[in-house]
Amino acid sequence: MRLSLIAAARAEGVAAKGLLRAHKWWSLRRLTQIMALGVFMAGPLAGVWLVRGNFASSEILGVLPLSDPFIALQSLMTGAVPAGVALLGAALIVLFYLVVGGRAYCGWICPVNIVTDTAYWLREKLGITRDRKLDRRTRLWVLAGALLASFLSGAIAWEFVNPVSLLQRGLIFGLGVGWTVIAAVFLLDLLVTRRGWCGHLCPVGAFYGIVGKTSLVRVAAARREGCTNCGACFQICTEPHVITPALKGTGSTLILSGDCVNCGSCIDACPVNVFEMTMRGRSISPH
């Protein structure tokens, strides 16, 4: 029943907006993810070195350093102070996500999101209803565990099992242990629990959620008085608990939780255009 309701809600959105408009933010997001992965892959596979490095640490055109601040924090926990250029790269990333929202990384950049979205899509198509409940705070414990492991081992612990790094290496060097981890993430989301990895376990998402909690760019239920209670936004959202205060509350219409990935899926799904992307009140929705 639940899956048929999801399909009906999506069909209503497509009927109201048309196929392209009902997938506008999804299309932009997927294009951004593919482009991000593509620039990292272009060097090793085609000799086009726009970016050298990986999602953890890289350099754009040999000039602009970028470093994952979560990696930098783990490095500090090992007792090693990262090089100045690495700290600069981490600071640039933090500043960027303070503007666009920390977990925008999850929805717009992270290639593993493509894996988990595919698992969710297939889950619906196959009618899989099993949904083992996990506390979403578990990812905070995994985050703390990664930092503690780095402190105790003197190594950047999360990189040994980081699905993002393992996926990139697997695409370049072929099959290996990395694909086992990616398969485990896929099967978790497909067979065990809805949005299990991104929504409940990933420490990188937990970290960026903390970073971007006060970010400028937000989704808003700007026209919540027009809500028809179809439930499409809740069904499609990777973090549905973030919607309720903005949509059903009496205070701010902004979705203020750091868990929001600013993906725009609720904007796409809503047949009556309740939601919009805003920057402290100024609409930045694409046209």
UniProtKB/Swiss-Prot annotation:
GO cellular component: plasma membrane
Record pathway: One-carbon metabolism; methylamine degradation
GO molecular function: 4 iron, 4 sulfur cluster binding; metal ion binding
Disulphide linkage map: none
Binding-site residues, [4Fe-4S] cluster 1: C227, C230, C233, C270
Residues binding [4Fe-4S] cluster 2, per UniProt: C237, C260, C263, C266
Keyword annotations of the record: 4Fe-4S, Electron transport, Iron, Iron-sulfur, Metal-binding, Repeat, Transport
InterPro entries linked to this entry: 4Fe4S_Fe-S-bd (IPR017896), 4Fe4S_Fe_S_CS (IPR017900), Electron_Trans/Redox (IPR051684), NapH_MauN (IPR011886)
Residue ranges of every copy of the 4Fe-4S ferredoxin-type domain listed in the record: 218-248, 251-280
Stored PROSITE patterns: 4FE4S_FER_1 (PS00198), 4FE4S_FER_2 (PS51379)
Function field: Involved in electron transfer.
Name this polypeptide is given: Methylamine utilization ferredoxin-type protein MauN
Species of origin: Methylorubrum extorquens (strain ATCC 14718 / DSM 1338 / JCM 2805 / NCIMB 9133 / AM1) (Methylobacterium extorquens)
Source taxonomy: Bacteria, Pseudomonadati, Pseudomonadota, Alphaproteobacteria, Hyphomicrobiales
